[in-house]
């Protein structure tokens, strides 16, 4: 009789124990996901490309993983950065490539389409077109302390540091560096090339 009572008690308690285990597991999982999301938001952000100023490196609709300012402290030549400048497009984020940093001098031969930094012509295999479009800034120009000079890879279809509404960008206006293409946008023929997914150069 006692044995039957024990077995009955075990059967009655088993579902409760299982349910509690599941609830504890779900509680821990939700807590872990919340922590991961908070850390991710502090260290990274996802930005969607709008427009063709970085063509053909980046396409309209590309999803980019961007390191936040916590991880990205010092912009350097060649970095693809995301910045927000109040004087341009109501502070909407812009995506450009760093051409020069503080103390460097930028000059552009618009006829030849060549960019010079400290007198040295840049080898720019990432550009879609030569730099022929002059937007209003007078060159040569020396980059002020705490600032960077940026341009889009689609040089004749980009509003960037050549334009007075953008000019030099204060490094405090830099939101982060684009490091990885998560999901591809579409090209001019509306094709989506998934083999573009990967680290950005």
Where are these regions (language model features)?
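Extended hydrophobic leader/signal-anchor segments used for secretion and membrane insertion
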Residues: 1-201
